[in-house]
Amino acid sequence: MYQEFFVNTAQNETSDNGIIFIYISLSVFSATIISYFIPQRFDLFYIYLLIWFGCFSIFFLIFKSKIIKSLYTIRTRIRKSTVWPTSMKIINGICWAAPFALGALIPSMHEYLILAGIGFGNISTFIIFLLNNKIKNIDQLIVGIICMISIGIIIFLYDGKVIEKSYGEFLARILISIAYGIGGIYSAIIKPE
């Protein structure tokens, strides 16, 4: 049973998120590390944009052919999601968007809400695809679970005075990068039977 759940069987489609997740992981990690060394001043905001755009662009060029190849599968999945019942679309949208919207309203909880948005969003998408389309995106489930666990990690580190609150967003981005990296590696390594 364990293997049947975590390895896609013949009746289920496989996930092709691996390269996309690895791309996201490397881009977020690189941009986060480089941004860390730039002084945090509002007048340098454009530099942050250049760093993030540059990191995503560089890794896109590195993985270009594989990303373009996997976009066909992703486009097919998006088409399948258009036939979901309206209630499921709303639930999925709320899972993705609500934490990010709250992050704008409650900046002091931004790092938790980023992780919650990615966690709830990936978990809800996994569940809905599994129920409606028989697609096992275990890599999405992995990303979601790691992001949710990461909220606890940050709380533990704050309470234990291991890190200061000012490093929370940096740590959240690193943990997001790790989550997508693990999900991407899982997807790239685990193949259907």
Regions found by a protein language model. Name each.
Residues 1-21:
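N-terminal juxtamembrane cytosolic/stromal segments of multi-pass membrane proteins
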Residues 16-22, 46, 136-143:
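Membrane-interfacial loop-to-transmembrane alpha-helix junctions, especially the N-terminal start
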Residues 22-105:
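Selected alpha-helical membrane-embedding segments in polytopic membrane proteins
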Residues 36-51, 101-117, 156-172:
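Membrane-helix interface and helix-disruption motif detector
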Residues 53-60, 116-128, 175-187:
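Alpha-helical transmembrane segments and their membrane-interface exit regions
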Residues 60-79, 126-133, 184-193:
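C-terminal ends of transmembrane helices
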Residues 83-145:
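Membrane-proximal helix-loop-helix units in multi-pass membrane proteins
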Residues 128-193:
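Terminal transmembrane helical module of multi-pass membrane proteins
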